Swiss-Prot record:
Record's keyword terms, sorted: Hydrolase, Membrane, Protease, Thiol protease, Transmembrane, Transmembrane helix
Active-site positions on this chain: 132, 325, 355
Biological function: Probable cysteine protease.
Lineage: Viruses, Varidnaviria, Bamfordvirae, Nucleocytoviricota, Megaviricetes
UniProt cross-references to SMART domains, sorted A to Z: Pept_C1
Species for this entry: Invertebrate iridescent virus 3 (IIV-3)
Family label: Belongs to the peptidase C1 family.
The name this protein goes by in its record: Probable cysteine proteinase 024R
Enzyme class: hydrolase
Membrane topology: Single-pass membrane protein
GO MF annotation: an example: cysteine-type peptidase activity
Length: 491
């Protein structure tokens, strides 16, 4: 149960102007007041004291690069289900579980599935580079290898390799669909042991928490200029993906509102996380929504610390547009008895997503819940939508990408970069880059899922008033009572 205490009367607004409002964890990236302690806790504040957010992708476009989902693809997925009938999900061929994800362990999971969940990637950090398209794709490829049983370790796939060898817009954005296609047709992709994110993570120009109001410079010039590893003549695993890469979006191909969500769920259960694109709005960026109302993001919510949660179309209009973003969907669930409109409650289905704004973003260790379509109609995954920004420029986003892997990674000798020309120090000792560590098996044991799916403890009650505030509020009432009592004293 989530506790909420909203005080929006005139007295509160008066006192709010006089002192900061303390909300645990919520960070507001507008002109509104926030407590400095909250900003510090958020992980979004750079060493210079400036609150920053990652630059958002303007090139997330899943159309035109890969084919839409068709009847043959449903048949293929059905055959995969049939093949896995002896697995722990066999009884869900028709009835899918209402809650499932690759982060937590559920009672239905067998020992093999529990072991695989140890190797699923946690949220990464793209820093100031607009590389969500590369970071989310790299993590999903590694997950796919784990779920397919092709590796018995965490692959730790390299986003830097994607930015270098399949550059697209590099730090200005790109399409996960096109990246997957190029990986399947090219020379694959390697792990961070070959080429990691040092170009950004160890460079002061890039390793801030993100750009203030998304006003980051284009940092593509920092990306290595040619494919290769930091250490030459070293053996590294090369991973690839199958050519079967598909777009899922309502109204595209044979995808409908009736079949899209069940198809996505079955793919996640069978093959692992999928990739999704969506519009990021002003009310999303702070991650404050992850801490209230079941943690589900509704694009019509205000999500302003210190104010009652209300819903209005203004919050998902073009004036609120911030950019487009790509993330991995790792599961789904149902939030029980949450507000989905002003003064309206109910059970709302959501997608459980892994962001790339580091694990300190939001209140769920870098993960978040996105209300499914049609609960959200602008910031959502299932439908391609067009949104015009405040300058009347149209933007199009939405859709989900599915893919599969079926070939074990192969160790190959890689070329060496000229590290003397690199404008940054490496994150780790040189020996770490000397070859892949297939024995990389994190000791972290996945936690049991809460009964209602991924959730965080409720927020402590926000502290809006000091003792002086309360005294000033109560004093007038006491004076009135005293006057009334004096008036009743017999003369």
């Amino acid at each position: 149960m989530t506790l909420e205490w909203n005080i929006d009367d005139k007295f509160h607004l008066f006192f709010r102007k006089k002192r900061s409002v303390y909300i645990v964890g919520g960070v507001h990236h507008d002109e509104d007041e926030v407590d400095p302690k909250v900003v510090a806790q958020s992980g979004l504040q750079g060493d210079d004291g400036v609150v920053r957010l990652p630059p958002l992708n303007t090139l997330v476009n899943f159309l035109g690069h890969v084919s839409p989902y068709m009847h043959a693809d449903y048949a293929f997925l059905h055959r995969e289900w049939e093949y896995n009938r002896t697995a722990s999900f066999a009884d869900d061929l028709v009835n899918l579980p209402s809650v499932y994800d690759w982060r937590y362990v559920y009672p239905r999971d067998d020992e093999e599935t529990k072991r695989k969940k140890r190797y699923i990637m946690p949220p990464d950090n793209q820093y100031l580079c607009g590389s969500c398209w590369a970071v989310s794709t790299a993590s999903a490829i590694g997950d796919a290898y784990v779920v397919a049983g092709l590796v018995d370790w965490r692959p730790d796939i390299s986003p830097a390799w994607a930015l270098t060898c399949y550059p697209q817009g590099q730090c200005e954005g790109g399409s996960p669909a096109l990246l997957l296609k190029e990986i399947s047709q090219g020379n694959g992709i390697v792990s961070n042991h070959c080429l990691d994110y040092s170009f950004c993570a160890s460079n002061p120009r890039c390793n801030g928490a993100a750009a203030n109001h998304f006003g980051a410079e284009n940092l593509s010039e920092l990306v290595p200029k040619s494919c290769g590893c930091y250490v030459g003549d070293s053996m590294h695993y090369r991973y690839t993906v199958d050519p079967l890469i598909r777009t899922l979006a309502i109204g595209v191909g044979t995808v409908t509102e009736e079949n899209i969500q069940s198809t996505i769920k079955r793919h996640i259960l069978t093959h692992g996380p999928v990739l999704a694109g969506y519009f990021v709005l002003k009310n999303f960026t702070s991650g404050y929504f992850t801490r209230i109302n079941g943690g589900v993001y509704f694009d019509r919510g205000n999500y302003i610390p210190g104010q009652a949660l209300v819903f209005n179309d203004h919050y998902c209009s073009g004036d609120s547009y911030r950019g487009s973003h790509a993330v991995a969907i790792i599961g789904w669930g149902v939030a029980r008895n949450v507000l989905y409109d002003t003064d309206k409650r109910g059970d709302v289905p959501y997608w459980y997503c892994r962001n790339s704004w580091r694990s300190t973003w939001g209140g769920d260790d870098g993960y978040f819940k996105m209300a499914m379509y049609p609960w959200n109609r602008v910031a959502q995954f299932e439908k391609l939508v067009t949104l015009r920004d405040r300058d009347n420029v149209p933007h199009r986003c939405g859709g989900i990408i599915t893919f599969t892997v079926s070939t074990k990674p192969v160790k190959v000798k890689m070329n060496q970069l000229n590290t003397t020309l690199l404008p940054f120090p490496l994150l780790r000792d040189r020996s770490w880059y000397g070859g892949d560590q297939e024995e990389y098996r994190p000791a972290i044991v996945p936690k049991l899922a809460p009964s209602d799916g991924p959730n965080k403890p409720p927020l402590p009650l926000p502290v809006y008033y000091s003792a002086l505030d309360l005294a000033l509020l109560v004093l007038p009432a006491l004076l009135i009572v005293i006057v009334v009592l004096i008036g009743k004293i017999p003369t």
